[in-house]
């Protein structure tokens, strides 16, 4: 029998059933879940080290190899969001004193700089204003000057809406004995990406964008060059949880008996498996086409409202996340609030260096439809009519 009186009573809020609003998520992610992925989240638990779970993990690895377009054996899932995958890449590849070149044209490059500094690397940011991208010439100048072991680029910069070209960067990096790390969290499934053909050494992405899975798992793959760098390091990675040698074994990437590392998020992996199955059934090229066509339709509807697209060059616009310049005289927070309060549609403002400059509209996976474009543009039309506007 308990000997002490409880100091904390049951929270009243938890004595009521959970209630979730029905909203259309057209921000930069997470996205709405298709019925098949929602159903996967309600399946019964199995053992995290059972043969059935290992089979699911192997199927997930094959799915990642398909969406990444890679044959890398060292391909797995990180139990954490895209930030976790970025940190896993950096803590395993970089050692204190290593030179690290970063394309910092938005918040994700800024985060890479932060993590690199925490590791003790010599970090060299190539800083650009929101909306900027990198040319081969600019990167080659950085490679020649700083002689880095690793270059970071964001393929889909969701805070600014920029799609970074990747062709030629892998070959360029390898000429300077540098590895190429690419963030594809916001671009995967929405625009062409070829890990092996483009010479990308480390590629990672997240579950909650165009894959339409719940947040909390991330996808990552390493080339043989990246594996050699990680496996020949002189010091242990400072994170045990993100140690790729352990994770590679647990995910069956090293042909050795699997050993326990951590308890994986079994239910989340069911959902991720189903999201990869859906995109495999649709076909990558069809998924890319769907996002390209939906984005083009959105751009036309936005311009018909008199709104200006933040990224001027159509070739550099990220199909999955469109950035719109905040219209003159309006507070972006008023527009975002009006759209969610009156239409149950989520859009977002800027993030990091783009805060206050843009509105962000996401067309991710199953949400990339003309019907959703019509809904969000009508909501924006109403917001522009009813939100307060300052005289300029």
From Swiss-Prot:
Binding site for substrate: 360
Compartment(s) of residence: Peroxisome
Cofactor: pyridoxal 5'-phosphate
Entry annotated with the keyword DNA-binding: no
Modified residues (N6-succinyllysine): 225
EC code(s) of this entry: 2.6.1.44, 2.6.1.51
Gene Ontology CC entries for this record: cytosol; intracellular membrane-bounded organelle; peroxisomal matrix; peroxisome
Keyword set includes Transferase: yes
Activity regulation information from UniProt: Alanine--glyoxylate aminotransferase activity is inhibited by 1 mM (aminooxy)acetic acid by 97.5%.
Effect of residue 156 to R: In HP1; loss of alanine--glyoxylate aminotransferase activity; loss of dimerization; decreased protein stability
Phenotype upon changing residue 205 to P: In HP1; loss of alanine--glyoxylate aminotransferase activity; decreased protein stability
Mutation effect (residue 183 to N): In HP1; loss of alanine--glyoxylate aminotransferase activity; no loss of dimerization; no effect on protein stability
Keywords of the record: Acetylation, Aminotransferase, Disease variant, Peroxisome, Phosphoprotein, Pyridoxal phosphate, Transferase
Lineage: superkingdom: Eukaryota
Assembly description: Homodimer.
Function as written in the Swiss-Prot or TrEMBL entry: Peroxisomal aminotransferase that catalyzes the transamination of glyoxylate to glycine and contributes to the glyoxylate detoxification. Also catalyzes the transamination between L-serine and pyruvate and contributes to gluconeogenesis from the L-serine metabolism.
Disease: Hyperoxaluria primary 1: An inborn error of glyoxylate metabolism characterized by increased excretion of oxalate and glycolate, and progressive tissue accumulation of insoluble calcium oxalate. Affected individuals are at risk for nephrolithiasis, nephrocalcinosis and early onset end-stage renal disease.
Protein's name according to its UniProt entry: Alanine--glyoxylate aminotransferase
Organism expressing this protein natively: Homo sapiens (Human)
